[in-house]
Amino acid sequence: LEEQGKRVRASEAVFDHEARKVTWTERDPNQSQPPRTSALAFSEPIQDILTVIYFLRTQKLEVGKSFDVPVSDAGRVYRFSVAVVERKDLNTVLGRVNAVRIDPALFGEDGLVRARGALSIWITEDSRRLPVKAQLKVDLGTFDIKLKRVSYPEGKPSR
């Protein structure tokens, strides 16, 4: 459920990877109007805004390289570039870790977010590939995000 002032919307994306189709449904729970639905076909693997974080963790991240990622959101497909910017030692809740910084180009006129801004995400270079830090810069200000805790199911190793 997304609320922006008086505007409220509930949205859902259903991915059918066998049929290579995504169906997007959006409705206002405060209105009796039928939901707005759109469907589109895709020809390559595609992510939504949440699974893209997992997808980025599975990629080979070499400093100086970049790659494109297709993402479906709000009934459209966006392609954005991800630059692998730097390698850095960070102090984190996990202790001192080697991490790589990626900068997904989400912002801009044709971007997923039609505003000025920048996002950086640091992912550990160990086998866990955990996102331990992020920084979001927008007109409103700069937001620093840090991983606070990691928990594993019983019986799973922590490293």
Predicted regions and their residues:
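Acidic, serine/threonine-rich low-complexity disordered tracts
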Residues: 1-19, 58-159
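Contiguous hydrophobic, core-forming segments of folded domains
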Residues: 1-63
